[in-house]
Amino acid sequence: KTTSTYTVACQQLLNPIAGSDVSFKEEWWNEWEIRPYTLNAYIMCDPAHSRKKGSNRTAIAVVGIDANYNKFLLDGVCHRLSLSERWEALKMFRTKWKRAPGIREVKIGYERYGAQSDIEHFKEMMRIDGSSFPVYELNWTGGGGSQSKQDRIQRLEPDLKDGSFFFPFPTDEKRLTSHQKDYKIKKQEFLISKKILRKNEEGKVYDLVDWVKKNEYMLFPTIHPDFLDALSRIYDMDAMPPISRTRRSLEPDAEARY
C-alpha cells in the first residue's frame, strides 16, 4: 500500500505541518456500479450527543470488504440523532445487511469516547427486544480533539490513492449503465448501486454520498468531517475479507464494476 503523504511528512520530513493541510484529491474518488457478491460488512458509528444546530452530526458508515481488501461504502447516515434514534439506526442497518445476499458477516463498532452509557442503553433495548449482538468499542490511542480526528481520517489516504476505496455510483434507475442492465436481466438488482437518501433532523431529504463528497471530502480538513471519521474507523475494526463457506463456489462472484 502507498504510504500517506501525512505519514511521510511526519516520519521522513520530521515536519507534520507539511502534511497537515493535505486534502483528498477528486481523482481519488472512485465509484462502484456493481458491488461484489461476497462481502463482510462493518457498521461504524461516530456519535454526536447534541442535536443543536451547528453541532457535530452522528455519522454511521456501512463498509463492505471484499476478498482483495477493497472497501465499498454500502450505506450510512450523517445527521443529528438522539440516543434512541441511534439505536434504531444501528438495528436497522444490522438487520438490512445481515439479510442482504452475499454478506458473510456483519459487525458493529462504536466510538469509545462517551460510548459506555450509549452501549448500556443498547443492551437494555436488546433485552426489551429479545435480541442480542455485540457492539465493539472503537478505541483510539492518539488522544482527543480535532487534530486527533484529522489523524484518524488521514488513514484513508493510502486506500483512496491506490483506488481501493469505492463510493456508490449515483444510479438513475431510469438510465442504468450497460453493466447495470446486465445485472437487472440476471435478476441481481440487489448488487446495483443506489443513491443513499436520508431524512435529516429537520425532515429534509439529503443524498448522503453527494453531501459527504461536497461538504467533507472536497473540503477536508473541514470543521466537522464526521462521516469521514466514521469511515476511517474501518481501520479499528480488525476488518477481514470474507471466507467462502464452500471449497468451490457453485456460482462465481459478481465482478465489481468500478
Where are these regions (language model features)?
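A residue-level signal for conserved active-site and pocket-lining positions in enzyme catalytic cores
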Residues: 12, 156, 230
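Mg2+-dependent endonuclease catalytic cores in nucleic-acid-processing enzymes, primarily RNase H-like
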Residues: 15, 19-21, 59, 66-215, ...
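Metal-dependent nuclease catalytic cores in nucleic-acid-processing enzymes
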Residues: 93-97, 228, 232-238
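Acidic two-metal-ion nuclease catalytic site recognized across multiple nuclease folds
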Residues: 233-258
